Every structure is written in structure tokens, then in C-alpha cells.
Amino acid sequence: MSAQILDGKAIAAELREQVRKQVEARVERGGRRPGLAVVLVGADPASTVYVGKKRQACEQLGMHSSAHELPAETTQDELLALVDELNGRDEIDGILVQLPLPDHIDEQTVIDRIHPDKDVDGFHPVNMGRLTLRLPGLRPCTPNGVMTMLAHAGIELEGKDAVIIGQSNIVGRPMAMELLNARCTITICHSRTRNLADRVRAADIVVAAVGRPGFVPGDWIKPGAVVIDVGINRLESGKLTGDVDFAAARELAGWITPVPGGVGPMTVATLMANTLAAAEARDSRA
């Protein structure tokens, strides 16, 4: 048995095209192009690549983007002042501060400063709370993108046992809430979890988000399980790989995401969808 591939690249292309058409229709109605401000502090190579991809996506979909590249020595107060300015600018619908930030800046303080209506990453406590309470809001991009992928493939979630490996605020926790809202029974695993292999082997859905290459061996996967690999790890050879042993897991899983080409493209496409949604929501409140 060989798993079916959840082709995030193809599904993301469909989502991006939907967003592009909606932006085009919005402009034809006399509306303003959605605007995304992207803030980068320092010159971390991976962050620089991600920011470039997000800006490129904006341009391809007919959105306005503004880049704010700050030196690594930027103070927290200076960054907060920029966020305040962007919060007040009418042409900006979404604000994205690329993480991680330099050690001298507290990430949560910065996230909290972004207005919830412009928090297109979905990390603000207000938006996290709305997700938890099953209320409409801007949802974290990676978990939201995963849910879009699963829906596109027609994968039934209700009643399934889901294991999420990793408890980060960016992926693990909101992913658990997304799956809980879909009526899965969820287990969140972390560095103190006992009998991790047994828990994973019992799961119908496995989400790996720990940032360690090959952390999940193929023989941990239950036959027919859905495997979502959120990890993006660069080996010394330069090759990108996920948190799951893809070749071995593919022989047992029913569905599996590749790395690259799985979850990553969905994250960027969902960010674009969130930016459009933020613009539409702001218009409805005007």
C-alpha cells in the first residue's frame, strides 16, 4: 500500500486563484486593493526567503504589499511604534511581523500590539480565543491551511482520533482546536509525553510539528492514517525534509503530505485569503 499524496502546492494554487478572482472583482466594484504590511527585523536567511514569498504572492494576486525591513538592533519600542503606525493606516488591512524576532524583543508583546482585525497571522489572543470558542475570526494560517487541504481531499474527520506532536502557539495548539472543532478526539503530545510511539500508532490523524528531521519513524504510523508533516528542516546537504520519515510512512499511511510541497504552500495561500478577509471585514464595519 502506498499513501495518496496531499498535494499542498496544487491545492494552494487553486486557493490563490480564488483569492485573485475575488480581489479582481472587488477592484472592479470600485473597492480598494487589500494591503499587507510585512515587517522583518534582522536578516535571518530563512525569514528573508519567507518574506519574499509572501510579498511575491501579494503582487501575483493583485494585492498591495509594503515591506518594512529593520536592522537586527531595532529596539522593542521602535518595533512597537511601527506596529502602532501600521494599525492606523487605512490602506493596510493586514500586518505580519515575521517570526522569530531577535532575542531582545518579546514576541508576544509585539503580537499583542497588532490590532486583532489586522492580525492576518491569527496569533493575537483575541483571534486565538475566537478559534477556541468556535467564533468567526482570523485563524492561524498553517492549521487553517491544513484544514483546507483535508476538506479538499474529502477526508472525513468527525469521530477520528488525532494526535498532534508539538504544542507551539503557532501550530500545535491552534491545530488541536481546529481538529477539535471538526469533532475529532485530540491528543497533544510534547517533550514530556510518555509512550509517544504508542499514542501515534493509535492515531487516525497524525500532525507532526516539532522541527526535528525524521522524528516520526514510518513504523509509528497506523495503516490508513492521515499524516500531516508540518516540519520544514534543512539538512547539511541543503535538502529540505520534514519531521516524518516520508518514504517509510508512505508505505503505511492512507494520505500523507510531502516536504516540500505539502503544508508550506498552504500557509502562504491562507495568509493571502486572510488578508482579503480582513479587508472585506473592515469594509463591512465602515
Curated annotation (Swiss-Prot):
What name appears for this protein in its UniProt entry?
Bifunctional protein FolD
Q: Which family does it belong to?
A: Belongs to the tetrahydrofolate dehydrogenase/cyclohydrolase family.
- Signal peptide residues are none
Its recorded reaction(s) are: (6R)-5,10-methylene-5,6,7,8-tetrahydrofolate + NADP(+) = (6R)-5,10-methenyltetrahydrofolate + NADPH; (6R)-5,10-methenyltetrahydrofolate + H2O = (6R)-10-formyltetrahydrofolate + H(+)
GO CC, alphabetical: cytosol
Q: Please cite one Gene Ontology biological process associated with this protein.
A: tetrahydrofolate interconversion
Q: Which UniProt keywords apply?
A: Amino-acid biosynthesis, Histidine biosynthesis, Hydrolase, Methionine biosynthesis, Multifunctional enzyme, NADP, One-carbon metabolism, Oxidoreductase, Purine biosynthesis
**Which Gene Ontology molecular-function terms are recorded?**
methenyltetrahydrofolate cyclohydrolase activity; methylenetetrahydrofolate dehydrogenase (NADP+) activity
Q: Which gene encodes it?
A: folD
Question: From which source organism is this entry?
Answer: Alkalilimnicola ehrlichii (strain ATCC BAA-1101 / DSM 17681 / MLHE-1)
Q: How does it assemble?
A: Homodimer.
